[in-house]
A protein has these predicted regions:
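Conserved active-site segments centered on acidic
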Residues: 2-91, 162-169
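Phosphate-binding/catalytic loops
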Residues: 2-6, 94, 100-169
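Helix N-cap/beta->alpha junction signal
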Residues: 25, 99-100
Length: 169
């Protein structure tokens, strides 16, 4: 997304954030973009991006393992990692964190209570996995961990898309 582009007040701007912006948040970005494209009510109506708390992977593509697992489900993860910054709160309507640490870090990046009110935990939107309160980081895990992360993100993004369609988010 071009940060210099003028914000369209009729569109919803969503930012997904994880620790390094190479596993969970780019997956959420890719999944949400595909869900929006597949939904005629949302196509062209939402702008989606992702970022990381840290800058370690800036400029890199998502982790190859996440890209491979996502590709098997039909998602193209081709964004480049970047670090979240305070100005993101000017641009985005909702900022989703993946776990408690992300949420706490985002609250520190936010400059005021209005910006903090934009922060949500993506797991709060899961409807099929009530046993999870976060989207666990698969980075040090196995293929099963990447599949689980994708399952949880898909679940939450379906609900986010549903609420966006009904304008209840």
């Amino acid at each position: 997304m071009n940060i210099f582009e003028e914000k369209n007040p009729r569109k919803k701007y969503l930012l997904f954030v994880c620790l390094g912006n190479i596993c969970r948040s780019p997956a959420a970005e890719g999944i949400m973009k595909q869900m929006a494209y597949d939904n005629p009510q949302l196509r062209g109506e939402i702008i989606v991006d992702s970022a990381g708390i840290g800058a370690w992977h800036t400029g890199q593509l998502p982790d190859n393992r996440m890209r491979e697992h996502a590709a098997r489900r039909g998602y193209d993860l081709n964004s480049r990692a970047r670090q979240v910054k305070p100005e993101d709160f000017d641009r985005f309507d909702i900022v989703f964190g993946m776990d408690e640490e992300n949420i706490a870090d985002l609250k520190r990046v936010a400059r005021n209570n209005d910006e903090r009110a934009k922060i949500r935990c993506l797991a709060d939107y899961m409807t099929q996995h009530p046993e999870y309160s976060t989207v666990p980081d698969p980075y040090y895990g196995t293929g099963r961990d990447f599949e689980l992360a994708l399952d949880l993100i898909e679940d939450a993004c379906r609900e986010v898309a549903e609420r966006l369609t009904k304008e209840t988010i």
